[in-house]
Amino acid sequence: PEGALSLVCGSARELTDNLTAQDAVAFTGSADTAAILRNHPNVVGSSVRMNVEADSLNTAILGPDATAGSAEFALFIKEVSREMTTKAGQKCTAIRRAFVPKALMDDVAGALEARLAGTVVGDPRNETVRMGPVINKSQQKDVQDAINQLKTEATMILGGDPKLVDADTDKGCFIAPT
């Protein structure tokens, strides 16, 4: 029926300030942002209903029969790379883990490293750019700290130094795909 569904666009602050008890919010994103939304004074005071999907742990799994040179192997490399670089990996549906049979680890590492090395990082308004910045300096530091920690615990696949295009490093928060 008319009015059963409304889509209102604007900044989150403006939207949450204008919610009423009859409204419901569906949010997909980080648990931290969901907590901020849930605790917004207007959301609490008006008992706004919320549906939250937060911090997904999406996985890519490579089967032992998907060997280098196969279509499945190529698709796995393409999709893992795409998930790492689209929106700089900052989307709730991004792959967070890739499970690879030990026998295929060297092949996957080499193929993924080669693909990531070709990733152009910079201002996403430039058509040649395939990976933009992370959201802010705090996130950039968190990601870099996590990378540094992981380097002490695991084998890292590095995309090399990012090839920055139309990027202002004083304003943008760029990280090489890792």
Regions found by a protein language model. Give the residues of each.
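PLP-dependent aminotransferase-like
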Residues: 1-11
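ALDH superfamily catalytic-core signature
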Residues: 4, 21-27, 31-177
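Short acidic active-site motifs
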Residues: 14-15
